[in-house]
Amino acid sequence: MTETASRRTLHITTWGCQMNVYDSGRMADVLRPLGYRQVATQDADMVILNTCHIRERASEKLFSELGRLRALKESRGGAMMIAVAGCVAQAEGAEILARAPHVDLVVGSQAYHRLPELIAEIEAKRRAVIDTDFPAAQKFDLLPEDQASQGPIAFLAIQEGCDKFCTFCVVPYTRGAEASRPAAAILAEARRLVAGGAREIALLGQNVNAWHGEAPDGATWNLARLLAELADIDGLARLRYTTSHPRDMDAALIAAHRDNPKLMPFLHLPVQSGSDAILARMNRRHGADLFRRIAGELRAARPDIALSSDFIVGFPGETDADFAATMRLVRETGFALAYSFKYSRRPGTPAADAADQIDEAVKDARLQELQAVLRDQQHAFNRAQVGRSFEVLFTGPGRHPGQSAGRSPYLQPVVVDNADIPPGTLRTVKIVQSNPNSLMASLTQEQIAA
């Protein structure tokens, strides 16, 4: 390990959800006052691997990368600090050091605000350190106010943890119980993000629509009220929130999609299965008809809203009839975008010990069938945008010279040829071509905002 004074370069590798991306940015913010600047892995004196534990091969991916970093560290005579952060760190703790003794630090998802102290402890004691505690004080309260600009589209964590305990999911064990940040702290961070150039803010949480935070006057706000307060921030043009649970989609939040003009007409609402029997075994505590009702109420409140979702196929005990129910829900609902996965066992979760695991070949066939329908729906949704005009938030140059790229209200990448549009600009465009994963557009004369 090198001395603190000489270790001032940093690389953070991030796997997993948008919350992990947010956490990685905040880790960089925590370390910036110590003089750390971000560089490529091969040039870094400290490497942080911010891990995800959702998929089956998460640990294998981690230890493969740790093997590569071990060789790099040894080539420098040990002059590199290696840290494992995030959900695998939280779940496996000391096991990481047992399998990879060249790791210097294992820091859980609730402790990264303590990075300066942990680094100092490593330097003082000349040994590896583990911190996977769930402290009573929320980490958000202890993070520095100064943070790097995220650009025109920014993410803001307002809630963390999960109390739902779905039988397939590790999040309650790696992120802890549901905790909501106070509204005042969220509003203050949002204003800082806007001052730093953000035009769109996406609110983050494992169950973001479960947020019920303390208001400035000591009362409790729900997410709909928070969105209304955020909409009053000058310079903020767009709002989103993710990820939601159907059980927490209340009437006030559905009404917000009708009443809040800054709330974008796109919602990610995971359902996982269309079978009531499988939803019960997943401990989702809702049925497929609740999801159908919510989708209908959202579309009644905001006719132009588009939905995305998550699906798991091959969950233990899933029959052909159960899978057919999922396919029926998909066809009836229609999704602009969806993420689908084969069920994978997560150690320590109830479903991992179920006796009626599904054969991998059956999982593969079901996933292929589901993804074909979801892909067709996404392509159809994109094709339906051709000829429409709407605002695009431009974020920077496109992949080819002379292009400008941005995001539609539905999160689709939109590209305009022969345009040099500054990042952060909202312009009305007309969609002229659809691709499977993006849209091509031409500019109209009206500029919505600059």
Curated annotation (Swiss-Prot):
It is an enzyme of class 2 (transferase). [4Fe-4S] cluster 1 binds at residues 17, 52, 87. GO terms for cellular component: cytosol. [4Fe-4S] cluster 2 binds at residues 162, 166, 169. One of its GO terms (molecular function) is metal ion binding. Residues 148-380 form the Radical SAM core domain. Its cofactor is [4Fe-4S] cluster. Residues 383-445 form the TRAM domain. It is found in: Cytoplasm. Keywords: 4Fe-4S, Cytoplasm, Iron, Iron-sulfur, Metal-binding, S-adenosyl-L-methionine, Transferase, tRNA processing. Residues 8-124 form the MTTase N-terminal domain. Catalyzes the methylthiolation of N6-(dimethylallyl)adenosine (i(6)A), leading to the formation of 2-methylthio-N6-(dimethylallyl)adenosine (ms(2)i(6)A) at position 37 in tRNAs that read codons beginning with uridine. Monomer. Belongs to the methylthiotransferase family. MiaB subfamily. This is tRNA-2-methylthio-N(6)-dimethylallyladenosine synthase. The lineage of its organism: Bacteria, Pseudomonadati, Pseudomonadota, Alphaproteobacteria, Acetobacterales.
